[in-house]
Amino acid sequence: MVPVENTEGPNLLNQKGREAETEGSCGASGGGHPACAGGPSMFTFLTSVTAAISGLLVGYELGLISGALLQIRTLLALTCHEQEMVVSSLLIGAFLASLTGGVLIDRYGRRLAIILSSCLLGLGSLVLIMSLSYTLLIMGRVAIGVSISLSSIATCVYIAEIAPQHRRGLLVSLNELMIVTGILFAYISNYAFANISNGWKYMFGLVIPLGVLQAIAMYFLPPSPRFLVMKGQEESAGKVLRKLRVISDTTEELTLIKSSLKDEYQYSFWDLFRSKDNMRTRILIGLTLVFFVQTTGQPNILFYASTVLKSVGFQSNEAASLASTGVGVVKVVSTIPATLLVDHIGSKTFLCIGSSVMSASLLTMGIVNLNINMNFTNICRSHSLLNQSLEEFVFYATGNLSISNSSLREHFKRITPYSKGSFMPMGNGMEPKGEMTFTSSLPNAGLSRTEHQGVTDTAVVPAAYKWLSLASLLVYVAAFSIGLGPMPWLVLSEIFPGGIRGRAMALTSSMNWGVNLLISLTFLTVTDLIGLSWVCFIYTIMSLASLAFVVLFIPETKGCSLEQISVELAKANYVKNNICFMSHHQEELVPTQLQKRKPQEQLPECNHLCGRGQSQRPSPDT
């Protein structure tokens, strides 16, 4: 374990204080308090970037299995259910950590949690590459799941607590940007090592040096000033703030931090399920929103991208991995403008646009796949020697040839596509359609001249259908990346009062990982039963349902302070008023409580709440 200085010691607070920072958890982009005096120094920015490396590691681990599974399922002869377990074991660890990680973060500090998560990720990766077995694969993936869940919470909170108020949204968004960048790197890695012997080891091992470097760097960075205040070390907190803000007087910000900590003790965890301040409605909105994040299908596209692409015509591992790299590129390109424009366009608008485009692209993908005569069942068959394709047997079986044997590869390329069948036991009167026998000498391979009987799939996917499927998939990914990808976490950070925001975020995070686990654990089985087209149609229905939910229940918080949002949502008839507004476009006045505020405490642009007015959130520079 990496030692830390006394200011991060294990002697304070249980779970009450957690990530309810002054202005919200991950994704908060504004606040009701006056802006802090200092701007973000270069030191603050570099500290945020160092912490956000956790997002890069999280994204890499989430996207990595898409390509690694193509090799591992052959080497271990994995069944459909075993493949699902390999993918979902990471989510099991993440779900368990989401239930208990907050206590660790509160007791030992955000910075120490990031260091521990980096070390645990390296340890889990070592387990994966030391020896390939199904049991060790599950154990290593569970350890990595615990790591990424812990780092997701800790990184988000740490950056939010060291960032100046009016730059918090920008700095916290670095974590989301790092996540999608990590996914892109994972897909590039999948492609780079797709045809390399033991390429899966390189895929799993690439993150180890980066994780170690982050752990070392985080050791030399300061703890969160808010955490120091929680421990009663106000003098140390003041020193950290002066270093982060490059100003000599941090009294005002320290006062705001202490005030927000007092607010946390006004609520208990069980208040989330009571009518106090309409909290029950708020938590139901939050839980339903993260439910739609998962049930619209994005996790399966992330984990099974290469598998899905193989089923629609990208038949080689290399082609499927290259096509899935486009998914990573689209995620990065789409996330950047969404992050930069959310303060001007609004999270609700992005959610509506994203859900609408997702439903259209999923419908297109489903219709296209109805016309592709391709059996998805081969994804779920056992990848034993009797069921391996010739290419899988020659190039990926344990102990077989390396990538350097160019003469063998050149000889293999001369075999026609219709010769690349699956090994099947023959005899007993079996006469499968498309049966063929071919004889092939494999020079310089150490293999004797052998006859192979194979069963070929005579269905060839038309190029137009194959590329239309890929285009629909990329549009779907882009729509998710501007809508249900980043925006729910911004909404969640704004709809709960500061005193209970951290615990609400923890509960919704557990819901997110839990539903993700259930969806990913059954994707291959369900697709095998009903077909990829009908899976797309189900996701289309869920996308339309999410659109209706966003329109009716999600407030437009653009241009509004956190206090204004909280006052509006605290009304017992909030849902009724929101639905009535959508039906009759009636205008709602600013709550009278807000009219009593001092002029300097109000945002003049926010005359109406939840989208009633079309004002914009003030620029950070104003």
Swiss-Prot record:
Tissue: Expressed in skeletal muscle, heart, brain, kidney, spleen, adipose tissues and to a lesser extent in small intestine and lung.
Main location: membrane
Pfam families, per the entry: Sugar_tr
Positions on the Cytoplasmic side per record topology: 1-44, 106-111, 163-168, 223-282, 343-349, 493-503, 555-622
Glycosylation sites: N195, N375, N387, N400, N405
GO biological process, one term: D-glucose transmembrane transport
Extracellular side, ranges: 66-84, 133-141, 190-201, 304-321, 371-471, 525-533
Region (Disordered): 1-26
InterPro entries per record: MFS_dom (IPR020846), MFS_sugar_transport-like (IPR005828), MFS_Sugar_Transporter (IPR050820), MFS_trans_sf (IPR036259), Sugar/inositol_transpt (IPR003663), Sugar_transporter_CS (IPR005829)
Membrane topology: Multi-pass membrane protein
UniProt GO molecular function: transmembrane transporter activity
Keyword terms, alphabetized: Cell membrane, Cytoplasm, Glycoprotein, Membrane, Sugar transport, Transmembrane, Transmembrane helix, Transport
PANTHER family (alphabetical): D-XYLOSE-PROTON SYMPORTER-LIKE 2, SOLUTE CARRIER FAMILY 2, FACILITATED GLUCOSE TRANSPORTER MEMBER 12
Function statement: Insulin-independent facilitative glucose transporter.
Annotated family: Belongs to the major facilitator superfamily. Sugar transporter (TC 2.A.1.1) family. Glucose transporter subfamily.
Protein name per UniProt: Solute carrier family 2, facilitated glucose transporter member 12
Organism: Mus musculus (Mouse)
